[in-house]
């Protein structure tokens, strides 16, 4: 063997332990929760508890509203949110190995903003959004919660927030975490993309980039964009459930066809955060781009 070949062979051997030590990403299976601030506790309870029909739990000075045994909404009560025109505090995703995922992100030079404790840790994405990863079934008030008979939906299917630099966000969400393109589009047929959806690597839930928000969105504009979505098989069932829960106002029955071909209905909590009811599957062909992933179903939440 020539000296050059020997050198290359030895270099390969020496590199094998380092490669073997690189942690791999464990599965990220879906949305765990979305967390929002509210400035009106009574009105928030009426909206999330009475109108949407979720039973309230309390933990760590927060209100938890289980959607199912592995997904929930978190509400933080404060008279003065950190940013006056922003109510979203965090989004969270489920993994079956939070410890391994934390080490994986550290290996990619992403230092936890909130170190792993009680099955959860948090990091900041490139635009400063708090992203929490939750060990499967680690939140007992949710994992043991009974289904609410008055819930208008039992499935969270996506979360969305304002994104200003799509390339930077893609480097984190796609290249490091492995999220996959699902659909993108805009309000007009002019090629401008206002919404870009990325599915979790190991499930059907998705994150929606809300693009082109402008330099200074007001509270309502931010609330439209920083949102979460509840899935339903048939929108009429959601309308019926909302009526049973004494939903007030014209939005309670105002269904519309989304540009992605899915029927939707939008409500707003007391702090202008949008809750988007959406059918699991499209009722017609989407605009702008085809879907590139499997659609969610009622029973495929994080198990």
Question: What residue spans do the PLM features occupy?
Answer:
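A mature extracytoplasmic/lumenal domain signature
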Residues: 40, 52-53, 60, 69, ...
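Vicinal oxygen chelate
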Residues: 22-26, 29-39, 64-65, 71, 80-155, 160-161, ...
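Positively charged n-region of N-terminal signal peptides that target proteins for export
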Residues: 1-6
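Residues within well-ordered alpha-helical secondary structure of globular protein domains
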Residues: 13, 50, 104-107, 175-176, ...
């Amino acid at each position: 063997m020539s000296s050059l070949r020997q050198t290359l062979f030895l270099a390969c051997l020496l590199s094998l332990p380092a490669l073997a030590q690189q942690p791999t990403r464990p599965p990220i299976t879906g949305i765990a929760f979305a967390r929002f601030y509210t400035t009106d506790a009574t009105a928030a309870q009426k909206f999330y508890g009475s109108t949407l029909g979720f039973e309230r739990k309390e933990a760590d000075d927060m209100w938890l509203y289980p959607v199912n045994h592995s997904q929930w909404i978190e509400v933080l009560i404060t008279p003065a949110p950190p940013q006056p025109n922003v109510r979203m505090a965090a989004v969270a995703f489920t993994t079956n190995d939070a410890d391994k995922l934390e080490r994986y992100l550290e290996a990619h030079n992403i230092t936890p903003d909130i170190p792993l404790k009680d099955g959860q840790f948090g990091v900041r994405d490139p635009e400063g959004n708090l992203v929490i990863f939750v060990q499967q079934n680690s939140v007992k008030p949710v994992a043991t919660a009974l289904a609410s008979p008055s819930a208008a939906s039992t499935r969270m299917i996506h979360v969305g927030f304002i994104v200003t630099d799509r390339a930077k966000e893609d480097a984190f969400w796609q290249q490091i975490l492995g999220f996959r393109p699902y659909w993108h589009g805009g309000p007009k047929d002019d090629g401008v993309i206002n919404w870009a959806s990325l599915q979790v690597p190991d499930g059907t839930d998705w994150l929606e980039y809300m693009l082109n928000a402008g330099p200074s969105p007001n509270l309502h504009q931010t609330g439209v964009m920083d949102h979460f979505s509840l899935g339903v098989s048939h929108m009429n069932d959601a309308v019926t459930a909302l009526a049973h829960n004494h939903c007030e106002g014209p939005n309670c029955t105002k269904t519309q066809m989304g540009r992605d071909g899915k029927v939707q209905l939008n409500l707003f909590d007391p702090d202008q955060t949008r809750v988007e009811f959406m059918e699991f599957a499209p009722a017609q062909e989407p605009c702008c781009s085809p879907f590139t992933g499997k659609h969610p179903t009622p029973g495929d939440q994080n198990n």
